[in-house]
Design a protein with these regions (language model features):
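A short beta-strand motif characteristic of beta-propeller blades
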Residues: 27-31, 68-73, 110-116, 154-160, ...
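Beta-strand-rich domains and repeat architectures in extracellular enzymes and scaffolds
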Residues: 30-58
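Beta-rich, blade/repeat-based domains predominating
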Residues: 34-45, 76-88, 119-132, 162-175, ...
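Conserved beta-strand positions in repeat-built beta-propeller and related beta-rich domains
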Residues: 50-55, 91-99, 135-141, 178-184, ...
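A short loop-to-beta-strand structural motif that recurs across blades of beta-propeller domains
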Residues: 58-61, 99-103, 143-147, 187-190, ...
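Short loop/turn segments that connect beta-strands within beta-propeller blades
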Residues: 63-67, 105-109, 149-153, 192-196, ...
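Loop/turn-rich, solvent-exposed surfaces of beta-rich toroidal or solenoidal domains
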Residues: 250-278
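Blade-level signature of beta-propeller repeat domains, shared across WD40, Kelch, NHL, RCC1
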Residues: 297-332
């Protein structure tokens, strides 16, 4: 395990002013189970959208064609936090309050629970696939990065060396290496899949609170800083650059995604209503700021459907939302 500090060049930039703020269309559907905190949607290979109800212990699927919802009950008290859907249609979810990763077979409704091998790993948080048959995941309060072999069900846990770092958002780069942010540690981290050696990189301002992470086509790491109101980038050579979000320190950026044109989509959860922001990662400028019609309340995670060129997210206003990616960036 290695912590890297003082080895990077830090460049802090002011937020570039957009030429003209345009808006994109945000479509929302009311989830039929009130106050269930729908969150963390994921688009399955068949185009249907799965998500969890964190407060009501369910997984559900939405068909954008028929606009129908279907609910699957999860173990009582599981507190599902996140899910992802494999090519075979099996749904893998994080049992955040019961220290397990679950596997739901939608054809039968049967659920398999894979327990964490260490009692300290009590709260699996966010899951992501790699291309080698694994699921990588964060364990926020337990302070681990985990790897689950989907075939054998073996779980490897790597303890984060920074105490109480609260590893949060996680993504896997094209080379199969997972990258994650430490919400309370003020760092970006990565794990070598071969050796399970963990490396950390300090953010320019350790008081920051990075929530989510995205990786662009150049391999640069992007993140949103919830407390400082910034979007930041760590390049492949270890240099940092940050920009203020449109609402500044009160922006509270949370959910983050990236499209296949390296445009960053994130949600400012500080303003009421919440606001969806599109930021051009190549030109380093804000392209669009759009209020979320339902108000949002908070938007914690989003997913990009490259096949259909759309982002999906869920809101604390009990809605499921879709944003279609513009063919050309607004005001380009």
């Amino acid at each position: 395990m290695l912590t890297v500090a003082g080895l990077v060049t830090v460049v802090v930039a002011a937020s570039p002013a957009p030429a003209q703020i345009s808006q994109v269309q945000v479509e929302e559907w009311t989830v039929p189970w009130p106050e269930s905190r729908p969150r963390d949607p994921y688009v399955a290979p068949d185009g249907r959208v799965w998500f969890v109800g964190q407060r009501s212990d369910y997984a559900a699927v939405f068909d954008p064609v028929t606009e129908e919802f279907r609910r699957y009950e999860l173990p009582e008290g599981a507190g599902p936090h996140n899910l992802i859907v494999a090519e075979d249609g099996l749904v893998w979810y994080a049992g955040n309050r019961q220290a397990h990763i679950g596997v739901l077979d939608p054809a039968t409704g049967e659920i398999e629970q894979i327990r964490m091998p260490d009692d300290r790993a009590r709260d699996p948080h966010t899951l992501v696939f790699d291309d080698a048959g694994h699921i990588w995941f964060t364990v926020q309060n337990g302070n681990f990065i985990g790897r689950l072999d989907m075939a054998t069900r073996r779980i490897d846990l790597v303890e984060v060396p920074t105490p109480h770092a609260r590893p949060y958002g996680i993504e896997v780069a094209e080379d199969g290496r997972p990258w994650f942010v430490e919400f309370a540690g003020g760092k970006i981290g990565t794990v070598d899949p071969a050796s399970l050696r963990l490396e950390e990189f300090e953010l320019p301002d350790r008081s920051g609170r990075p929530r989510r992470i995205a990786i662009d086509s150049h391999g640069d790491i992007w993140y949103v800083d919830f407390s400082l109101g910034e979007i930041g980038r760590m390049t492949t050579n270890g240099e940092f650059e940050t920009w203020s979000v449109p609402s500044g320190p009160e922006g509270r950026p949370y959910a983050l995604g990236i499209d296949d044109s390296d445009r960053l989509y994130f949600v400012e959860t500080g303003p009421r209503p919440n606001r969806l922001v599109i930021f051009d990662g190549g030109q380093m400028r804000t392209l669009s700021v759009t209020p979320i019609p339902s108000g949002g309340g908070s938007v914690r995670h989003m997913t990009f459907d490259g096949d259909r060129q759309a982002f999906w997210f869920a809101t604390d206003a009990n809605t499921l939302a879709r944003v279609r990616v513009p063919i050309e960036p607004p005001n380009s």
